[in-house]
Amino acid sequence: MERLKRMSVFAKVVEFGSFTAAARQLQMSVSSISQTVSKLEDELQVKLLNRSTRSIGLTEAGRIYYQGCRRMLHEVQDVHEQLYAFNNTPIGTLRIGCSSTMAQNVLAGLTAKMLKEYPGLSVNLVTGIPAPDLIADGLDVVIRVGALQDSSLFSRRLGAMPMVVCAAKSYLTQYGIPEKPADLSSHSWLEYSVRPDNEFELIAPEGISTRLIPQGRFVTNDPMTLVRWLTAGAGIAYVPLMWVINEINRGELEILLPRYQSDPRPVYALYTEKDKLPLKVQVVINSLTDYFVEVGKLFQEMHGRGKEK
C-alpha cells in the first residue's frame, strides 16, 4: 500500500511538472513530496527525475516507471469504480478526448449537467484538432465526427451532426438570398480549409445531387473564426449545426437552401474495452446519444421553418 502511495505521488509530480504543483494538488508539503520521490529512487536504485532550480524532467528510467505507474493506478481506480457501479453510481475521473468545437458546443454544457447529477464524478476534457489519441493520452473515451479509421478500437455510433449552409441576415439583406446551389458562386464564401468540410453535396427534392467545392477570399482552419465571420456578415458558409445553433436560435444567422438535403456527419465514441465498459463512460455515451436525437429533431424544425418562408 505504501508503495502504491509513492507511485501516485511520483505520477502527480510528472503530470503537474513540479514538486510545488503536486504538493498543492495532494495537500502535502513540498519536502514530503521530494522525500517520497527520493525514497522511490533509493528503493529502485535508479534516478527517475532530472532536477534543476527551474524545472524537472524524466530520465529514461523515469519515463518507463511513469508509464507503468499510470497503468497500475488506472487499474486500481477502475476496480474501485466497478465496485461502486454495483450501486449504479459512476465515480472517478472521466477522461474525454474530442475536438475543441465538440468541447465548446456540446460537451461543456453536457458534462456540467452530468456532474450535478453525479457528485462522485469528475471530468478531464482534453481537446485538439484532430481529436486526442485514446491510447497515447490515457483517455477513457474519444468522441469523433466523420469516418473512422481506428480499426483496433471499439466504437459506438452516437448519432449524426446535421450540416447547414447559412449566413447572417445582414449579409442576405445586402446581397440577396441564394435560391439554388448554383447561386452560391456569385456570393462571398467563407471557406473552412479542413477536409472534408471544404467540399460537399446538396441534394434537391427530386434527387439531383450537386457537388460543391466553393472557394472564397476568407479561408481559415479555425471554427471560431469562421463563425465570427458569419455573424459579422462577411459571407456564406457550410458548417456543422452545432457550431451555429445558438446564433440561429437568436436570429443572427439563417439557414439557406432549406429545400436541399446534405449528408450529416456521423459521430462516434471510441474506447478500448467492449465488454467491461465503465459506468462513467456509459453515462456520457447515453447523454450524447440523447443529445444527437434532440439535435436531429431541432434540425428538422429549423428546416421546416425555412421551407415555409
Swiss-Prot record:
Keyword Transcription: yes
GO function terms (MF aspect): DNA-binding transcription factor activity; transcription cis-regulatory region binding
Domain HTH lysR-type: 1-59
Pfam families the record matches: HTH_1 (PF00126), LysR_substrate (PF03466)
InterPro entries in UniProt: LysR_subst-bd (IPR005119), Tscrpt_reg_HTH_LysR (IPR000847), WH-like_DNA-bd_sf (IPR036388), WH_DNA-bd_sf (IPR036390)
GO process terms (BP): DNA-templated transcription; DNA-templated transcription initiation; positive regulation of DNA-templated transcription; regulation of DNA-templated transcription
Organism superkingdom: Bacteria
Phenotype when the gene is knocked out: The mutant is hypersensitive to p-hydroxybenzoic acid.
Activity control summary: Activity is regulated by p-hydroxybenzoic acid.
Family note: Belongs to the LysR transcriptional regulatory family.
Cited PANTHER family: HTH-TYPE TRANSCRIPTIONAL ACTIVATOR TTDR-RELATED, HTH-TYPE TRANSCRIPTIONAL REGULATOR
Function: Transcriptional regulator that activates expression of the aaeXAB operon, which is involved in the efflux of aromatic carboxylic acids such as p-hydroxybenzoic acid (pHBA). In the presence of the effector pHBA, acts by binding to a single target within the aaeXAB-aaeR intergenic region. In the absence of pHBA, binds more than 50 sites along the E.coli K12 genome, including genes related to biofilm formation and several genes involved in stress response, suggesting that it might play a role in quorum sensing in the absence of pHBA.
The protein, known as: HTH-type transcriptional activator AaeR
The organism of origin for this protein: Escherichia coli (strain K12)
Top-level taxonomy: Bacteria, Pseudomonadati, Pseudomonadota, Gammaproteobacteria, Enterobacterales
